[in-house]
UniProtKB/Swiss-Prot annotation:
Gene3D superfamilies, sorted: Classic Zinc Finger
Keyword rRNA processing tagged: no
Main location as per UniProt: nucleus
Species of origin: Danio rerio (Zebrafish)
GO CC entries: nucleus
Name assigned to this protein: Fez family zinc finger protein 1
Described purpose of this protein according to its UniProt entry: Transcription repressor. Involved in the development of the forebrain region.
Length: 429
């Protein structure tokens, strides 16, 4: 994994006779520069990664030797000359390949001379690939530059290696997009990258060649996997969405998303109607239904039918009434095919097919399908009859019975000021 880039001697001068073709010493080493490359573009762009496993065209590796590892990304240059470091004559080394400067620029790599600000001349650069794993440094232009395998033990933090990401360290000081930079600075990403690949305290020299090759292959794709899994990353990185709480009725199995709705539903099975109208004695399960019901005992009917002129106290009642003129009966009984304008009437009719009459009178044992029918029946056992005929003064428990009485006996159609029709068959459901 240890490699470096350096200038060919042909660019900076021919090798001297005293050195015998070795690299020419220089007062300062060449520095790695990303800022110059990034400054040429108006907007920061992500830097493409080099192909770490494909040898240059025309340069085949010997079949008998193991496949060498590319490490084209130099880390932070350090001035260190430990005696165990291997000094390599890069010009004569068999594992060097010539690269054109344009090819290096295309992958985002560039060298600049610290003594001058000018861009390097277009020429030939040398890419050194280590023959063995422990070839971790070499003398470039007379100064020791440590790269990936700096030291005998595990790679030290001062070498600029970001969490054993050999391709990530040089990106931290570049004007990358914030999302790209966060992929390298995230602590979770760092911990996950090292967990299974490089045990702590293990030297790179102790790792097998195949292990390093496998690690480099995974590291090369670590960024692309994170960048292009946008949707999956947002889903997986966020906290798991908890399912909404549900409340199930133990009697009928109906499911509600709030406990309040379940509480409102339970009187359907118990038959309790604690909210009673003081005018007609009709009971309701909810206080809001009772408030709407009280309107029928007033003379306020702002909603009128355009076809027959009949007035209603609520717009919903008018909408239901218009179905009569249109002949629209959306609620069809699946047993007999009879249609109904209102859903409440449809439900009441279905009970006639089942024969079930669970609401019984405690006095006469008469049974009813609906609890509101039992409520009206109870008026027959007392003297309370809220609906009175204006002509003869006869009282009725229900407004429906009063209207029938007026039409049959007095031959008068109910006018706008006649007692309004209760809507208990729909409101109490």
């Amino acid at each position: 994994m240890d490699s470096a880039l350096y200038h060919s001697a042909g660019i900076f001068g021919a090798p001297s006779a005293s050195t015998g073709g070795s690299m020419i010493a220089s007062s300062k080493p060449l520095a790695f520069s990303i800022e110059r490359i990034m400054a040429r573009t108006p907007e920061p762009k992500s830097i493409p990664f080099p192909n770490l496993f494909q040898a240059p065209v025309g340069k085949a590796e010997p079949k008998q030797s193991p496949a060498p590892l590319h490490c084209m990304i130099p880390l932070m240059p350090l001035a260190c000359e430990p005696p165990h470091k291997l000094h390599i004559n890069g010009l004569d080394h068999p594992d060097t390949f010539a690269y054109n400067a344009n090819e290096l620029l295309s992958i985002g790599l560039n060298y600049k001379n610290e003594q001058q600000d000018a861009a390097p001349a277009i020429g030939q650069y040398k890419l050194f690939r280590p023959r063995v794993v422990n070839q971790s440094s070499f003398h470039a232009m007379g100064a020791a530059v440590c790269y990936l395998n700096c030291g005998e033990g595990a790679c030290p933090p001062h070498a600029g290696l970001v969490n054993l990401h050999p391709m990530a360290s040089y990106l931290l000081n570049t004007p990358l997009h914030a999302r790209q930079k966060s992929l390298f600075s995230s602590e979770k990403s760092k911990q996950g990258a090292v967990a299974d690949r490089c045990p702590p305290g293990v030297s790179f020299k102790e790792l097998s060649h195949s292990h390093l090759h496998h690690y480099m292959k995974e590291s090369a794709h670590i960024l692309s996997e994170k960048l292009f899994k946008n949707s999956a990353a947002k889903v997986n990185s966020g906290s798991p969405q908890t399912k909404p709480k549900v409340f199930t009725c133990e009697v009928c199995g109906k499911v509600f998303n709030a406990h309040y709705n379940l509480t409102r539903h339970m009187p359907v099975h118990t038959g309790a109607r604690p909210f009673v109208c003081k005018v007609c004695g009709k009971g309701f399960r909810q206080a809001s239904t009772l408030c709407r019901h009280k309107i029928i005992h007033t003379q306020e009917k702002p909603h009128k039918c355009n076809q027959c002129g009949k007035a209603f106290n609520r717009s919903s009642t008018l909408n239901t009434h218009t179905r009569i003129h249109a002949g629209y009966k959306p609620f069809i009984c699946e047993f007999c095919g009879k249609g109904f304008h209102q859903k409440g009437n449809y439900k009441n009719h279905k009970l006639t097919h089942s024969g079930e009459k669970q609401f019984k009178c405690n006095i006469c044992n008469k049974a009813f399908h609906q609890v509101y029918n039992l409520t009206f029946h109870m008026h027959t056992h007392n003297d309370k009859k809220p609906f009175t005929c204006p002509t003869c003064g006869k009282g009725f428990c229900r407004n429906f019975d009063l209207k029938k009485h007026i039409r049959k006996l007095h031959d008068i159609s109910p006018g706008p000021h006649s007692p309004p029709t209760p809507t208990g068959n729909t409101e109490g459901q």
